[in-house]
Amino acid sequence: MPELPEVETVRRGLAPALVGARFSRVTLRRANLRFPFPERFAARLEGRTVTGLARRAKYLTAALDSGETLVMHLGMSGRFDVALPDGSNLSPGDFYLEGAQGTPKHDHVVMAMSTGATVTYNDARRFGFMDLVPSAELAACRHFARMGVEPLDGLTGAVIARLFRHKIAPLKAALLDQRLIAGLGNIYVCEALHRARLHPEAPAGSLARPDGRPTPEANALAKAIVQVLEEAVKAGGSTLRDYAHTDGSAGAFQHAFRVYDRVGLPCSRPGCAGAITRIVQANRSTFFCATCQPPG
């Protein structure tokens, strides 16, 4: 599933085609994605201008001059393709490996823009969705009402200590809880925990002192999360088995993975003689170095 860096890469690539443009025609080629489209979805978009394109966690939000916001989630395999008036094509945030990319039969939403560009949403697995929400109620809508803090918006050890205090859940599980920190996924949590030298099964509450102040480990983790995400965004995300940019290029951060999907390979930390191992937590693979990420 596309994580925060991949969705941010999509946003940056898609913004030039959407922001300031008007929906001239919207064609739905099926009645639903993961969920049914909102009532009169195409009609509520047509004639409206996109005034801004933002990201909240793993969601894209396009503000419209109608007072509504188009909320979009890519699911497991969603992607956007942009056909420009000059005949060239872009695929903003194309993180899927060749062979896993969508085909025209999975083009479910086609949006003709006033600029002459055509933006197509393709989703082979149909786990993505689109919704329309009153802009004034966006923060309180069902998608975002219980969502946690943005990790790239001032995340500190003090914030982590406040969120994790008294929690007995494993550290990795707490980091994946979107009600605490929104937008983190399996890949970047594994990478951040390795950089912070923290075991994924350590109790989340251990990052807060009895008085609620952050431990050194909480400060290290906050720094690692921000570094990993910023580096991944700069690299254009990670190209995965199921995920592909808007310009058709691949994300490159997978080449910087230190633990993810590297079972049996030597730990990349200078001076560490350990190897990367894998365990399963909540039906998800966890990759870490048992030598420099010891338990307890």
UniProtKB/Swiss-Prot annotation:
Pfam family, one: Fapy_DNA_glyco
Protein family membership: Belongs to the FPG family.
Binding residues for DNA: H106, R125, K167
HAMAP family, per database record: Fapy_DNA_glycosyl
Gene name in the database record: mutM
Gene Ontology molecular function, alphabetical: 8-oxo-7,8-dihydroguanine DNA N-glycosylase activity; class I DNA-(apurinic or apyrimidinic site) endonuclease activity; damaged DNA binding; zinc ion binding
Native organism: Methylobacterium radiotolerans (strain ATCC 27329 / DSM 1819 / JCM 2831 / NBRC 15690 / NCIMB 10815 / 0-1)
Subunit and interaction comment: Monomer.
EC number: 3.2.2.23, 4.2.99.18
Active site: P2 (schiff-base intermediate with dna), E3 (proton donor), K58 (proton donor), R284 (proton donor)
Record Gene3D superfamilies: 1.10.8.50, MutM-like, N-terminal (3.20.190.10)
Essential cofactor(s): Zn(2+)
Official protein name in the record: Formamidopyrimidine-DNA glycosylase
Cofactor note: Binds 1 zinc ion per subunit.
Zinc finger intervals, FPG-type: 258-294
Summary of the function given for this chain in its UniProt record: Involved in base excision repair of DNA damaged by oxidation or by mutagenic agents. Acts as a DNA glycosylase that recognizes and removes damaged bases. Has a preference for oxidized purines, such as 7,8-dihydro-8-oxoguanine (8-oxoG). Has AP (apurinic/apyrimidinic) lyase activity and introduces nicks in the DNA strand. Cleaves the DNA backbone by beta-delta elimination to generate a single-strand break at the site of the removed base with both 3'- and 5'-phosphates.
Catalytic activity: Hydrolysis of DNA containing ring-opened 7-methylguanine residues, releasing 2,6-diamino-4-hydroxy-5-(N-methyl)formamidopyrimidine; 2'-deoxyribonucleotide-(2'-deoxyribose 5'-phosphate)-2'-deoxyribonucleotide-DNA = a 3'-end 2'-deoxyribonucleotide-(2,3-dehydro-2,3-deoxyribose 5'-phosphate)-DNA + a 5'-end 5'-phospho-2'-deoxyribonucleoside-DNA + H(+)
Domain of life (superkingdom): Bacteria
Keywords: DNA damage, DNA repair, DNA-binding, Glycosidase, Hydrolase, Lyase, Metal-binding, Multifunctional enzyme, Zinc, Zinc-finger
SUPFAM superfamilies: Glucocorticoid receptor-like (DNA-binding domain) (SSF57716), N-terminal domain of MutM-like DNA repair proteins (SSF81624), S13-like H2TH domain (SSF46946)
GO biological process: base-excision repair
